[in-house]
Swiss-Prot record:
Entry-linked InterPro entries: PadG, PFOR_II, Pyruvate:ferred/Flavod_OxRd, Pyrv_Fd/Flavodoxin_OxRdtase_N, THDP-binding, Transketo_C/PFOR_II
Noted pH dependence of activity: Optimum pH is 8 when measured with benzyl viologen. Half-maximal activities are obtained at pH 9 and pH 6.8.
Organism: Aromatoleum evansii (Azoarcus evansii)
The gene coding this protein: padG
Enzyme Commission number, as recorded: 1.2.1.58
A Pfam family annotated for this UniProt entry: POR_N
Protein name: NADH-dependent phenylglyoxylate dehydrogenase subunit alpha
Activity regulation note: Activated by magnesium ions and thiamine diphosphate.
SUPFAM superfamilies in the cross-refs: Thiamin diphosphate-binding fold (THDP-binding), TK C-terminal domain-like
Length: 417
């Protein structure tokens, strides 16, 4: 093969040049939705999600997204409308947060039970009382047992890319479950940064033939019962209910490998990659580590770099996929770690610790060895998790290596800010 022919062949396989823009996280999410070519969106605005659905509406109005849009009277109706669209075979999308997510709680559970591959962006917002419209993970964490896949984004670019991938993950025949793309309210929703837009033709090739709801799409020639009344003590109700739940669990576990496959395909076609389940940062020779979720990871990586320069053998573990929880990937990441500090942006009231810390304790148990650990809670109601905050986490976690006793209570990072 001549040099010219070889160069042409390499160029044909290389990702095409991408348009570069400055975009906020909410706009990046909307652009990712447009690239995935949904058939139907239904929306209701709520801070800090509002500008996202405004961007979606404008893309449709400008002819840049060919989708039907339904302006419903509230979030309960938003998701109910999309269930009907999905049952008819449409690719569907919405976004919400906080009280809006609470309002759609009933159809939210029904969506996963009916195995409808709807993509819903949660622009994460802290809980109410005392009132807050600022960022926090409490809303998303509150619904983590509702059968939805949940992935968390660190950057605006990751928001766009993950949004596109979410549709392919949800619609995979081994998964068929709805997906939450979670981005931090305020920090990512309104934070602007450089974003590369992949070519639409490349994304179309990546998405492939649409295969939405082949299992439940309504068809007069194939009648079926949708969401039947089950349970009780007579007939086959209990068995039917168990089959539904078992199928959801199977789809959730299948999602782990599918998420990895989809991320690998995206990296190959687009030329940009993100850790699909768990990101290991400077962990190869680390003696201890900190764990992060979402946008706090940027500041945490800077703090880890500074600590490394000071001679500390510290690494970082970022959880990208929270549901299903990546047990095996996390076991591998924790393989050589001797102490761990986990930073949550929400509260697990039952166990008096962060929800991610609670999940991690289960993984530590499965490791079969004791790793001293500390639960840190910070960034509530829009508070900053700064580099100095992370240095505190690093120093206190390192102290566990030298015999310090881990506190039995969570450490509240912003208590005295």
């Amino acid at each position: 093969m001549s040099t010219a022919t070889l160069e042409k062949a390499v160029a044909a396989k290389a990702p095409r040049k991408q348009k570069v823009i400055l975009a906020e996280g909410n706009e990046a999410a909307a652009l990712g939705v447009a690239l995935a070519r949904p058939d139907m969106v239904s929306v209701y605005p709520i801070t800090p999600q509002s500008s996202l659905v405004e961007h979606v509406a404008k893309l449709i109005a400008d002819g840049r997204m060919d989708a039907d849009i339904v302006d419903a009277e509230g979030e309960h109706s938003v998701l109910s409308v999309l269930q009907g669209g999905a049952l008819a075979g449409a690719r569907t999308y919405t976004a919400t947060c906080g009280p809006g997510l609470a309002f759609m709680f009933e159809p939210y559970f029904r969506t996963s039970g009916m195995r409808l591959p709807i993509v819903l962006t949660i622009v994460t917002r802290d809980g109410i009382t005392p009132q807050s419209v600022w960022g926090g993970h409490q809303d998303a964490m509150t619904v983590r047992e509702a059968g939805w896949i949940q992935v968390y984004c660190e950057s605006v670019q990751e928001v766009l890319d993950t949004t596109v991938m979410a549709f392919k993950i949800a619609e995979h025949h081994d998964v068929m479950l709805p997906v939450n793309v979670c981005l931090d309210g305020n920090y990512l929703s309104y934070g602007a940064s450089r974003v590369e837009l992949p070519d639409q033709a490349v994304v179309d090739e990546f998405m492939g033939e649409k295969n939405v709801n082949w299992h439940v799409a309504l068809d007069p020639l194939r009648p079926m019962a949708v969401d039947p009344l089950t349970g009780g003590t007579t007939g086959k109700g209990p068995q039917t209910f168990v089959r539904y739940r078992k199928g959801q669990c199977r789809g959730m576990q299948n999602a782990l490998s599918v998420i990895e496959e989809v991320h690998a395909d995206w990296a190959k076609r687009i030329g940009r990659s993100f850790a699909p389940l768990v990101e290991e940062y400077r962990l190869d020779d680390a003696e201890f580590a900190i764990m992060t979720l979402g946008s706090m990871t940027g500041a945490a990586k800077d703090a880890v770099d500074e600590a490394r320069e000071a001679g500390k053998k510290i690494g970082l573990i970022k959880i990208k996929t929270f549901s299903p929880f990546p047990v095996e990937a996390l076991k591998k990441a924790l393989g050589k770690v001797k102490a761990l500090g986990v930073i949550d942006r929400s509260v697990g009231f039952r166990w008096n610790c962060g929800p991610m810390y609670q999940e991690t304790l289960g993984v530590l148990y499965r490791l079969g060895r004791h790793i001293p650990s500390i639960s840190y809670i910070g960034g509530l109601a829009g508070a900053d998790i700064t580099i100095p905050h992370v240095h505190r986490v690093i120093d206190e976690t390192e102290a566990l290596l030298n015999g310090a006793v881990a506190p039995t209570e969570p450490v509240w990072l912003n208590e005295k800010d």
